[in-house]
Structure formats: C-alpha cells, structure tokens
C-alpha cells in the first residue's frame, strides 16, 4: 500500500524524523484556517499517490491565509496523471539551502535491503540514475545488522553530502531506517531531504510503501487505507478473505489457484473476441476453499458487479476435490438466492466425475456444466453477449 505524503510524514514524525509542521485540508476554507494557525508563508501541496506534482501545478507557495485559500481552490479537484486531488497538505514554508535524496528499499533482485542517497535531490531520482549515475550512492544493508549510527554516516558520506549536513543527515537516516523496519515497508523515500538555512536537516517530502503481506502485524495500518479510492467489491472481498480484483469485462471468473485463474482470463478474452469482445470481469482465486460459504461469498461479490452477465467457474481438483466444489456451488446458490445469471462450470481433476454428477442431480437451471476449458470459456462469453 502506497501512502499519501501526509501519512508518510506522520510515520516519520512518530519516529523522530524532522518534518515541517502542517495539516491536511479538504476545502479552501480549511486551508485558510491552517495557514492562519501556522502564520507566515506556507506551501499548499496536492495529496496524490503519484510523482510530478510540482510540474503539474500541484505544489504552490502561499503568502498568507487568503493566498492559501486561493491556492487550495486551484489545486483541489485537479487531475494529476489520472489522480483527482481530494486533499492538500498545508505546511510551513522551509528555508532551503540545499536539496538531497535518501531512501531505503527492498532489493528483490539481490534478496537484501538497499540504501540509496544522493546530493542531487529535488528531481526525479530515475533522471539522476540515468544522467549522473556516479551521483547516486547505493549501499547494501545487512538485514541482520541494519543501520546504526556508523552505517548511517557511511551512507551520508557515500552520497558526498557536505560537512555541514553530515551529522543531521546521519541522525535522520538512522531514524528513517527505523521507520522502514518498524512499519514493514518496502520503500521509504525522502526527496528532497533538505539542509535549511539554519543548518537543520529536514524531510521536506515523504514516500512510503507498506508491505500488505505484513498487515496482520499492523492493525494500525488500516487507518491509512484510502477508502475513496478502494473499489467497494474489492473491499468486501478483502473483508471475506478472498483474493479479488475487479476488471472491466462482463464474464465473472472463479477459479482455484492464481495460475489457473490467470489462464482463465486469457482463454475468456480469446473466446470473447467471437462475441463482440466480451472480457473477464474480475480475478477471483478461492484457493483451496470449496466450502459453501466461500463459494457464496465469491458469487455474491461477483454478482454485485452489474456489468457481469455470466460467470465461469473453472476448477481443477487437486487437494480440493471437485465433488466438494460441486456441493459448495449447490449450497452457495441456495445461500445467495434468486440467481438468474448463468454459471458455466468446468470441473476437472480429483473426483471430477462425481462433481459433475452432483451438479446434474441438483438440476439447477442457471448451472451450465461443460467438460473443457475452451468450451466453457466460449459458452460463458456467448451467454454474456446474449444477455447484453
């Protein structure tokens, strides 16, 4: 999960990383009130989960409360790279002497952690890496040792930071590492990291990506979820413990195993070309779950999408037997109730024949058993086209 700047800075502040004083506003009136409280010049910054805000006009300096009102009016509602601005961060303006760059990230290729730092801050780090690679220090971090004061200073020196910034930057880097580890982050980035006119080192911006796989250790991370941006069906699936991603098609997909579901998406897309370009409406992997409750939850979520005109249930029985899945489907339809959307069901593998027999005996009008994956995909696309 990527955080907004204000959320990243909240984490920073909790671990002692110096950040400018500021608050978020969702209306120009709130921005004016915050500017009045802060006094002096302020910066009004669009809160979106993408880069390039400054170039897009999403970061503006205001000379007082009324100017903050005007700047917030201009920024709120903006579209920045497909992201609508719903809030702004209003914070005290900083006296910037120099700008640097610092980050900690998960280095997947080398199966370790990596620190990156540079004296060239305030611009896209990809640009620095491409045009001046020698200006970007890369320091591998031993996961068992982490970043102590000595390691933090090593990073700052490798980045060729000036003497005036070394102590402050080293202290900040050590605290930034604590944020990275304690929050189970995959990325913690400060760009720019600034040296102020009075010699302080401050995180002027902040970017944090949290590892969703560690959510069970961090119930407090739930507060960071951008509810306005989360699809309600995806949120419902998450609450039910289902791996669901909403897509833009008409054929609902249920499968067991991510690989099989991905293959199903491809097969349905191919089959749909014959029927006006019908496409998968979702990704839903029920894993080893064949219970009536799991199937009912899955069907309820998929059928909650008004774009879905048919459902393709594609199961390859392994540890989970096909007869258990078939019973789950029969019971799920009773639980969900009043289902008119056709379900094309393909069962193969462990106890497939028994599963097909169960579905046949249930004699459910909406269930359309098909033996092959290609045949089932074609029928699902055809039924979706007929219902459109």
UniProtKB/Swiss-Prot annotation:
Single GO cellular component term: succinate-CoA ligase complex
Using the UniProt record, name the top-level EC class of this enzyme in a single word: ligase
Assembly and oligomerization: Heterotetramer of two alpha and two beta subunits.
Give the record's GO biological process terms.
succinyl-CoA metabolic process; tricarboxylic acid cycle
The source organism is Frankia casuarinae (strain DSM 45818 / CECT 9043 / HFP020203 / CcI3)
Cofactor, free-text remark: Binds 1 Mg(2+) ion per subunit.
What pathway does the UniProt record associate with this protein? Carbohydrate metabolism; tricarboxylic acid cycle; succinate from succinyl-CoA (ligase route): step 1/1
Entry function: Succinyl-CoA synthetase functions in the citric acid cycle (TCA), coupling the hydrolysis of succinyl-CoA to the synthesis of either ATP or GTP and thus represents the only step of substrate-level phosphorylation in the TCA. The beta subunit provides nucleotide specificity of the enzyme and binds the substrate succinate, while the binding sites for coenzyme A and phosphate are found in the alpha subunit.
Q: Which stretches make up the ATP-grasp domain?
A: 9-236
The gene from which this protein is expressed is sucC
Q: Binding positions for Mg(2+)?
A: 191, 205
Where ATP binds, per the record, is at 45, 52-54, 91, 94, 99
Superkingdom as given in the UniProt entry: Bacteria
Q: Which of UniProt's keywords are assigned here?
A: ATP-binding, Ligase, Magnesium, Metal-binding, Nucleotide-binding, Tricarboxylic acid cycle
Identify this protein by name. Answer: Succinate--CoA ligase [ADP-forming] subunit beta
């Amino acid at each position: 999960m990527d955080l907004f700047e204000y959320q990243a800075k909240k984490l920073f502040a909790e671990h002692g990383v110096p950040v400018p004083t500021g608050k978020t506003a969702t209306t120009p009136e709130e921005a004016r009130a915050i500017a009045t409280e802060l006094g002096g010049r302020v910066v009004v910054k669009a809160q979106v989960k993408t880069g390039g805000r400054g170039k897009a006009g999403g970061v503006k300096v205001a000379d007082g409360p009324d100017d903050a009102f005007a700047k917030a009016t201009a920024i709120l509602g903006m579209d920045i790279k497909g992201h609508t601005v719903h809030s702004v961060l209003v914070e005290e303006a900083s006296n910037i002497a120099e700008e640097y760059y610092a980050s900690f990230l998960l280095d997947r290729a080398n199966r370790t952690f990596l620190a990156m730092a540079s004296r060239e801050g305030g611009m896209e780090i990809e640009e620095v890496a491409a045009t001046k690679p020698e200006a970007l220090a890369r320091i591998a971090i031993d996961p068992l040792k982490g970043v102590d004061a000595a390691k933090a200073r090593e990073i700052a020196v490798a980045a060729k930071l000036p003497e005036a910034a070394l102590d402050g930057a080293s202290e900040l880097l050590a605290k930034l590492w604590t944020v990275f580890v304690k929050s189970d982050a995959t990325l913690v980035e400060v760009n720019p990291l600034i040296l102020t006119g009075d010699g302080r080192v401050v995180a002027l911006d902040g970017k944090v990506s949290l590892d969703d796989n560690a959510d069970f250790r961090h119930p407090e991370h739930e507060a960071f979820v951008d509810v306005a941006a989360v699809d309600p069906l995806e949120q419902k699936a998450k609450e039910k413990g289902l791996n669901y991603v909403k897509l833009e098609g008409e054929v609902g997909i249920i499968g067991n195993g991510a690989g099989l579901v991905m293959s199903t998406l491809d097969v349905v897309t191919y089959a749909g070309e014959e029927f006006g370009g019908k496409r998968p409406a979702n990704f839903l992997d029920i894993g080893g779950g064949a219970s009536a409750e799991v199937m009912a939850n899955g069907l309820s979520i998929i059928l909650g999408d008004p774009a879905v005109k048919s459902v393709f249930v594609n199961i390859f029985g392994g540890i989970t037997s096909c007869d258990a899945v078939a019973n789950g489907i029969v019971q799920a339809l009773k639980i969900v109730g009043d289902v008119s959307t056709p379900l094309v069901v393909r069962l193969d593998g462990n106890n497939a024949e028994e599963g097909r027999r169960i579905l046949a005996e249930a004699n459910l009008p909406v269930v359309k058993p098909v033996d092959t994956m290609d045949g089932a995909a074609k029928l699902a696309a055809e039924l979706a086209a007929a219902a459109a």
